[in-house]
Design a protein with these regions (language model features):
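Alpha-helical scaffold domains
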Residues: 1-159
Protein backbone atom coordinates (compact mmCIF):
# COMPACT_ATOMS: atom_id res chain seq x y z
CA UNK A 1 0.00 0.00 0.00
CA UNK A 2 2.80 2.45 0.82
CA UNK A 3 4.38 1.94 -2.61
CA UNK A 4 1.00 2.45 -4.27
CA UNK A 5 0.66 5.79 -2.47
CA UNK A 6 4.21 6.85 -3.38
CA UNK A 7 3.72 6.22 -7.08
CA UNK A 8 0.42 8.08 -7.30
CA UNK A 9 1.69 10.98 -5.17
CA UNK A 10 4.47 11.96 -7.55
CA UNK A 11 4.16 10.51 -11.05
CA UNK A 12 6.57 11.96 -13.59
CA UNK A 13 3.76 12.83 -16.03
CA UNK A 14 0.16 12.08 -16.93
CA UNK A 15 1.14 8.96 -18.90
CA UNK A 16 2.68 7.39 -15.81
CA UNK A 17 -0.33 8.40 -13.72
CA UNK A 18 -2.72 6.86 -16.24
CA UNK A 19 -0.66 3.66 -16.48
CA UNK A 20 -1.17 3.32 -12.73
CA UNK A 21 -4.87 4.03 -13.22
CA UNK A 22 -5.08 1.11 -15.61
CA UNK A 23 -3.75 -1.14 -12.85
CA UNK A 24 -6.12 0.39 -10.29
CA UNK A 25 -8.96 -0.13 -12.76
CA UNK A 26 -8.20 -3.85 -12.93
CA UNK A 27 -8.00 -4.03 -9.14
CA UNK A 28 -11.24 -2.06 -8.82
CA UNK A 29 -12.95 -4.43 -11.24
CA UNK A 30 -11.89 -7.44 -9.16
CA UNK A 31 -12.06 -5.98 -5.64
CA UNK A 32 -14.50 -3.05 -5.70
CA UNK A 33 -15.18 -3.09 -1.96
CA UNK A 34 -11.48 -2.80 -1.20
CA UNK A 35 -10.56 -0.22 -3.85
CA UNK A 36 -13.56 2.14 -3.88
CA UNK A 37 -12.88 3.64 -0.41
CA UNK A 38 -9.37 4.58 -1.59
CA UNK A 39 -10.76 6.19 -4.75
CA UNK A 40 -13.26 8.19 -2.69
CA UNK A 41 -10.46 9.36 -0.40
CA UNK A 42 -8.32 10.34 -3.40
CA UNK A 43 -11.30 12.22 -4.87
CA UNK A 44 -11.02 14.74 -2.00
CA UNK A 45 -7.21 14.90 -1.96
CA UNK A 46 -5.24 18.11 -2.37
CA UNK A 47 -3.01 16.15 -4.77
CA UNK A 48 -4.31 16.59 -8.35
CA UNK A 49 -2.85 13.24 -9.46
CA UNK A 50 -4.90 11.45 -6.83
CA UNK A 51 -8.03 13.36 -7.84
CA UNK A 52 -7.40 12.39 -11.47
CA UNK A 53 -6.78 8.76 -10.51
CA UNK A 54 -9.98 8.67 -8.47
CA UNK A 55 -12.03 8.93 -11.65
CA UNK A 56 -9.76 7.52 -14.36
CA UNK A 57 -9.49 4.26 -12.39
CA UNK A 58 -13.25 3.68 -12.49
CA UNK A 59 -13.63 2.92 -16.19
CA UNK A 60 -10.31 2.82 -17.97
CA UNK A 61 -11.25 2.52 -21.65
CA UNK A 62 -14.82 1.36 -21.24
CA UNK A 63 -15.93 -1.66 -23.17
CA UNK A 64 -19.09 -3.70 -22.68
CA UNK A 65 -16.92 -6.78 -21.98
CA UNK A 66 -15.41 -5.26 -18.84
CA UNK A 67 -17.17 -5.27 -15.53
CA UNK A 68 -17.75 -1.61 -14.71
CA UNK A 69 -19.04 0.04 -11.56
CA UNK A 70 -22.51 1.54 -11.71
CA UNK A 71 -23.07 4.84 -13.48
CA UNK A 72 -24.19 6.24 -10.14
CA UNK A 73 -20.78 5.43 -8.64
CA UNK A 74 -18.87 6.85 -11.61
CA UNK A 75 -20.85 10.11 -11.67
CA UNK A 76 -20.62 10.48 -7.89
CA UNK A 77 -16.83 10.59 -8.27
CA UNK A 78 -16.88 12.88 -11.30
CA UNK A 79 -19.34 15.46 -9.93
CA UNK A 80 -17.14 16.86 -7.11
CA UNK A 81 -14.37 17.47 -9.64
CA UNK A 82 -16.42 19.42 -12.21
CA UNK A 83 -14.99 22.74 -11.03
CA UNK A 84 -11.44 21.49 -10.48
CA UNK A 85 -8.85 24.02 -11.68
CA UNK A 86 -6.15 21.49 -12.56
CA UNK A 87 -5.86 20.91 -16.32
CA UNK A 88 -5.15 17.20 -15.97
CA UNK A 89 -8.16 16.72 -13.71
CA UNK A 90 -10.33 18.67 -16.18
CA UNK A 91 -9.16 16.43 -19.01
CA UNK A 92 -9.91 13.35 -16.90
CA UNK A 93 -13.44 14.60 -16.15
CA UNK A 94 -14.15 14.99 -19.86
CA UNK A 95 -12.47 11.74 -20.78
CA UNK A 96 -14.42 9.77 -18.18
CA UNK A 97 -17.71 11.31 -19.28
CA UNK A 98 -16.84 10.29 -22.84
CA UNK A 99 -16.05 6.75 -21.68
CA UNK A 100 -19.22 6.62 -19.56
CA UNK A 101 -21.24 7.52 -22.66
CA UNK A 102 -20.04 4.28 -24.29
CA UNK A 103 -21.58 2.23 -21.48
CA UNK A 104 -24.48 4.39 -20.34
CA UNK A 105 -25.42 6.84 -23.12
CA UNK A 106 -28.80 7.89 -21.71
CA UNK A 107 -27.56 8.59 -18.17
CA UNK A 108 -24.43 10.32 -19.45
CA UNK A 109 -26.45 12.67 -21.64
CA UNK A 110 -28.73 13.55 -18.72
CA UNK A 111 -25.64 14.35 -16.62
CA UNK A 112 -24.10 16.44 -19.42
CA UNK A 113 -27.33 18.37 -19.88
CA UNK A 114 -27.57 19.07 -16.15
CA UNK A 115 -23.92 20.16 -15.86
CA UNK A 116 -23.39 21.93 -19.19
CA UNK A 117 -22.22 25.13 -17.47
CA UNK A 118 -20.29 23.38 -14.70
CA UNK A 119 -17.82 21.78 -17.11
CA UNK A 120 -14.64 23.61 -18.06
CA UNK A 121 -14.12 24.18 -21.78
CA UNK A 122 -11.57 21.34 -21.74
CA UNK A 123 -13.90 18.91 -19.96
CA UNK A 124 -16.81 19.86 -22.22
CA UNK A 125 -14.72 19.35 -25.36
CA UNK A 126 -13.51 15.89 -24.29
CA UNK A 127 -16.95 14.83 -23.02
CA UNK A 128 -18.74 15.70 -26.25
CA UNK A 129 -16.12 14.89 -28.89
CA UNK A 130 -17.51 11.42 -29.69
CA UNK A 131 -21.18 12.35 -29.66
CA UNK A 132 -22.95 12.29 -33.02
CA UNK A 133 -22.26 15.60 -34.74
CA UNK A 134 -25.84 16.91 -34.54
CA UNK A 135 -26.04 16.07 -30.83
CA UNK A 136 -22.64 17.63 -30.13
CA UNK A 137 -23.73 20.79 -31.94
CA UNK A 138 -26.93 20.95 -29.86
CA UNK A 139 -24.88 20.70 -26.67
CA UNK A 140 -22.53 23.45 -27.88
CA UNK A 141 -25.47 25.69 -28.74
CA UNK A 142 -27.13 24.98 -25.39
CA UNK A 143 -23.89 25.78 -23.56
CA UNK A 144 -23.46 29.00 -25.54
CA UNK A 145 -27.04 30.15 -24.80
CA UNK A 146 -26.83 29.24 -21.11
CA UNK A 147 -23.54 31.10 -20.73
CA UNK A 148 -25.04 34.12 -22.47
CA UNK A 149 -28.08 34.04 -20.14
CA UNK A 150 -25.83 33.76 -17.11
CA UNK A 151 -23.74 36.72 -18.27
CA UNK A 152 -26.86 38.86 -18.79
CA UNK A 153 -28.20 37.86 -15.39
CA UNK A 154 -24.93 38.77 -13.66
CA UNK A 155 -24.87 42.12 -15.46
CA UNK A 156 -28.43 42.87 -14.35
CA UNK A 157 -27.43 42.15 -10.74
CA UNK A 158 -24.68 44.78 -10.90
CA UNK A 159 -27.07 47.52 -12.04
Amino acid sequence: REKKEKYIDEPENWEHADALCQLYSILYERYPKLVEPTLRQWNRSSNPWKRRASIVSTIYYATPRRKAPTIKTVLSLIEPLLGDKNTYVQKAVGWQLREAYKLWPKESLVFLKKHTLDLSATSFSYATERLPKNQRNRFKERRHLERKKKKLFLRSQKD
